[in-house]
Curated annotation (Swiss-Prot):
Coiled coil: none annotated. One of its GO terms (cellular component) is cytosol. The gene is panC. SUPFAM superfamilies: Nucleotidylyl transferase (SSF52374). This is Pantothenate synthetase. Homodimer. Its main location: cytoplasm. It comes from Oleidesulfovibrio alaskensis (strain ATCC BAA-1058 / DSM 17464 / G20). ATP binds at residues 30-37, 147-150, 176, 184-187.
Amino acid sequence: MQIITSPEELQRLCLDWRCGGVKTALVPTMGYYHAGHESLMAYARERADKVVVSLFVNPAQFAPGEDLAAYPRDLSGDAEVAQRAGADVLFTPQPEAMYPQGFDTWVEIPGLSSGLCGADRPGHFRGVCTVVMKLMLLTLPRLAVFGEKDWQQLAVLRRMAKDMHLPVTIDGCPIVRETDGLAMSSRNVYLTPEERRQAPALYQGLIRARDMVAGGERDTAVLRAAVKEYWKQHLPEGREDYLEIVHPDTLQPLERVGGMATCAAAVRLGRARLIDNLALI
């Protein structure tokens, strides 16, 4: 596995691959790998000739006061994981290489970015879309792989690829969970023992909504109220950022569950901001 820090060097390599008919897969990450990241790399490895994993804690997607400086990092450990997973390249640029002095070009998807996480984190998806567009232009992938835990991010990036006619397929991989149901996340290390004990209730609340739909309930206000009541009892230290039932593609809130519907939520628990989602049908 090559470790590359220069955008220009990466682009030259990937352009040679593309001209030679090589199928490249891109796995964008911010590092501090867990089994969820490994599942993305394994998915890419099975479907491409070459796999590029990017490891970049992207400052453009952090708002002032967020955890950019505190975000967990372990470059040597992550390199071992990426190599073991079969990555051909680990791309680890410095911020000044991706955003040199005078950088002033941004990619925004206003509609899909406005609700859910976008409402609470202004500018977040502008940073995500911009860095992913740059990574795609550097690597020229046929396939890009993301986790479904960040469902809104997946929907936004698919819209970007469609609107810009990018010759890339964007695939989502299922959420990888701890044995108690908590979605794996690099930020879970922020949780205290007591917060970690409560954290699985986020997912259990979503399961309650799914079970109610299976039992015939269709009113999303009733479903959301039931989830909030469950959290009140089992996640008392959590502070809800949002809880919505939306169409999985448009992310528009639904009044009734009549077809495809996803329950998406974000809860702050101590220093951690936990997100999760679950298809209700």
